[in-house]
Amino acid sequence: MSVIVKVIGREIMDSRGNPTVEADVHLADGSWGRAAAPSGASTGTREALELRDGDKSRYLGKGVLKAVGFINNEIATALAGQNALEQSTVDQVMLDLDGTENKEKLGANAILAVSLATAKAAAQSKKVELYEHIADLNGTPGVYSMPLPMMNIINGGEHADNSVDIQEFMIQPIGAKNFREALRMGAEIFHSLAKVLKADGHSTAVGDEGGFAPNLASNEAALAAIKVAVANAGYELGKDITLALDCAASEFYDKEANIYNLKGEGKKFTSEEFNFFLQDLTQQYPIVSIEDGLDESDWDGFAHQTKLMGDKIQLVGDDLFVTNTKILKRGIDNGIANSILIKFNQIGSLTETLAAIKMAKDAGFTVVISHRSGETEDSTIADLAVGTAAGQIKTGSLSRSDRVAKYNQLLRIEEQLGDKAPYNGLKEVKGQ
């Protein structure tokens, strides 16, 4: 029997030393699943609410005992006897129990941990892998692909304590024949970059997502360092490796002055000027993807950006869309961006996450599955990427176990699926 008999919540630690929520879901047949909710640093204002205790005497107010309490009491009671194979029903029970638009009563962290743990328990009950169960839930049974990784090898912005304003500088191993080879190429470039930075007298300390966090003179200097590292590793930029940016522009947007302020290099831009600044970078370097190139509320600016670059460059909405179908639909209807970043804790349940993926794909948008800067050893996003054939994944650099755990899971999945899960490289990127 795949009915839920026990739900357990607990407070565990994330990769930044902050508490987060973990849940176990047990079924009548002995099957069970465990999942943990991640946590972001640069968060969109429209994200579902991450419930924190606010008790300054404990974990600086970041405890999650309230959310854990909801799991162990209200949620556990409501889900007792529910069929774990009916994911949408399980999730809807929790959404109804919460009763708010942004999950502010129970917390998206509580609901998500239970939602994902339920999916894992159901997969075990069916005696299938998690990615296989996710493909079934997605309405695409047996359809898989290995994602093109977007590897964040230089961290800036809110993910690092340095002078670089753009948050992520990523490499994409488009020349690889399979995921295993892509991972190797990324690792070799990561180590090559360490040597380049050291030779120039820069720190090789890493940021939240495992990439280096040097103090560089400009954002362009980060791209220049990566260019040298790629060549030194024996690869050709533009042929073997392409580049991607996550600007996280909301973090350096001055709302009062209505300007984009790159403090690290002392430059200020209007919305239109910043679009041209980004376009100029794409003409100097093989940048094929730009995420959150403007503030999340700058819809006019995004419309201009999409007209300017949308036919050639993948323009990814993260803070812009926050994995929310209502907001995504507005973007689709108004010609804003052409790709969505998927972070399931932005919306708070697996069912709603799958709905966002479907809406994006149906509209011709590409999909990038993503981690958060505060992560755990939970590798569910690897299975999500393969099980939905999303095509792309962002899960950090080639260091820190919380990042590498996802890559290692993808290696295992590729070993299991072989030719059933093709690695399509650059074909997955919008505009390429």
Swiss-Prot record:
Q: Which SMART domains match?
A: Enolase_C (SM01192), Enolase_N (SM01193)
Lineage, please?
Bacteria, Pseudomonadati, Pseudomonadota, Gammaproteobacteria, Alteromonadales
GO terms in the biological process aspect are: glycolytic process
Q: What is this protein called?
A: Enolase
Give the positions the UniProt entry annotates as the active site: E209, K343
CDD domains (alphabetical): enolase
Pathway(s):
Carbohydrate degradation; glycolysis; pyruvate from D-glyceraldehyde 3-phosphate: step 4/5
Essential cofactor(s) = Mg(2+)
Q: Does the keyword Aminoacyl-tRNA synthetase apply?
A: no
Give the gene that encodes this protein.
Answer: eno
Quick one: where is this thing mainly located?
cytoplasm
